[in-house]
Amino acid sequence: MHWILALSLLLLLWLLVASPRLAWLKAGLLSLLLLLLSAWGLVDRLSGDGINAATLYHLRADMDGAGVSDFSGYIAVFIGMVLLSLSPLMLLRVRRFRRPRGGGAVFGAFVVMLLVSMAVSPVYRDGKRLYYQLRPVDYATVVPEYQVPQQPLQKRKNIVWIYGESLERTYFDEATFPGLMPNLRQLATEAVDVRNLTSTEGSGWTIAGMVASMCGVPLTTAPGDENSMGRMGLFLPEARCLGDYLKDQGYRNHYVGGADASFAGKGSFLASHGFDVVHDVNYFHDKGVAPKHFSAWGVHDDVLLDDAWESFQTLSRAGQPFMLTTLTMDTHHPAGHLPLACKNQRYESPLGDIGLLHAIKCSDRLIGELVTRIRNSRYGRNTIIVIASDHLAMPNDLSDVLAKQKRENLLLFLGKDIPPQQVVRRAGSTLDSGATLLQLLEPGMRTLGFGRSLLANDAPPSASVAASRDSGRDYPRYLAYARTLWTGRSTRMLRVNGNGDVVVGVQQVRPPVLLEYDDDTNLKTVYLENTSRQFDRTHSDGTLAYVDRCTAFEDGSADGDWCALVVDRNQHMKLYRDPDLTRGIAVDAPLDVTPQAPRPRVRQPIMLTQAARKTEAGRYMLELYAKRRPTRAFWVEAVSSERKVVLAQQWVVPDASGRIRMPVGLEHAVEDLGIRAWLDYTEEVSVDDLALVKDTAVADRS
């Protein structure tokens, strides 16, 4: 396919210069195609699998804490490709066209080759794959397969779960990586060593690998944009995970990780599913750990695993059963990091002096030392240790080598009463890790979510089997069911709670939010980004429900209350106000059939202040100048409490110079005062100057 794409691009370039007819249109289309391919190339270098579920997840999830500097080389190449993608536009400025005839035929051929290029491009392939994975499907047949543990534990052993970042079992291959991981290879001979463990769709990145192994479900975007972690109150609230079950059994769940817990919603996941303590990079900063012990991603593994050992001792002495979970970081792609404890440790390899190999060698030693400490302690006899890769390695400095190997995840179980054995399964994935641990804790337990114990010879149907059979034809059913775990299945009632969050099923979402229902009033899509634009452009066969401040819908609203605009398939509309939303509204209730005006263009809030400011009580005059502004009047508000409380509001019309004046009265001091405007998505405002002047006399005259 690659050679066909390359040939198609060359033909497109020739057809561009073959005729001057519609030359700028052809150049623009070719540049757009090249930009798409460049963007795909960057994403593929980061994900290792093109545009997939991980890409969609991270586009919406909180990216704070990502070690962006590690990928500066990829980004530099991408910038170069972007500039190269614009070359067709530049070519028209230097090329003199000498063939004035045949323009129509040339343009027709150009369009055909453009379609061919798209059809053979990886962008189309990935788009088609995502469509089949995320399209609405009937998941009813797999609902009985989702099982949660109910049986009480007879023996409550302590658990230490060590996730090795991208530390797949493939690195055990002595022929390719001789002597790279002697400690974990030795531990594998003393453990239940699971082989052929794959990562299914929805489990191939860190948070997804944790969700898959601890909940037995793939992590997939909720319908639409619910994976905007900052806007979701709960992380997979309908899932029942290992942490939830163990907490009910009297366990204390403790997590210590070196990265920022807010990255990709990891902290939200842990807090939502039974973890009592979540320590991340900020914990180590607060402890006063020296800067030399941090990388772009967080604290190094030597400091992290020392802290894990201290936590193990503290938790063990307390006498309460516990699960201690830790996640290493220094083997993160693309090149890894080396902590101070391993600065003098090198790995000699025929592959060359590769930093990632040094990092893997170090991780093997540090994890091995922690495991030895735990097993040799007086608490080791009552402890099960799990050593697992969170996912297969993403593109890194060893990708070309790994591509030639049989890839498999790492999963080891060690414990006093666990006889060593190598378990080989034809269809096993990280979805089955938690269920396998449960069987080791309690032999009669063999399921967790869609996961099945890999020790059971009579395991019932599972998502792992579905993913490996018939090219994964039935696997989208499991993905579809997993998406319902974000909101639940009873989503036809909407209400706004006392915190100003929209309650949808079991989920709480911070507005604005646009919900799209199908013709049977089943929740189809939830939009949390660009909601105003989405509302204007979405023409549904079902019902739309848009929830935001009444200011978004009405010119005459000045109360800051919540409203919901519901539009049915016949374009009948009804605006529900705050009292209705407090009680709750049914989106499938009949709407008035009186003649309706055209669907309004809904406004959205745009912050005019760059940062919130602390402001004392008093009367103020807000003065701002905006050279670029809407041609019509619009709302300006002063807000506080994370933009939830409206302190002042005015329907403003800038004067000829763009000046806006609005009185603001504060009865008490405000810690986070901000100024925002309400505009529709086609409008914009650019503030050149803004001042909040405390002047009682001026405020009174206004």
From Swiss-Prot:
Its EC number is 2.7.8.20. The chain crosses the membrane at residues 2-22, 71-91, 103-123. It comes from the Bacteria. It is a multi-pass membrane protein. Transfers a phosphoglycerol residue from phosphatidylglycerol to the membrane-bound nascent glucan backbones. NCBIfam families: PRK12363.1 (NF009027). This is Phosphoglycerol transferase I. The gene is opgB.
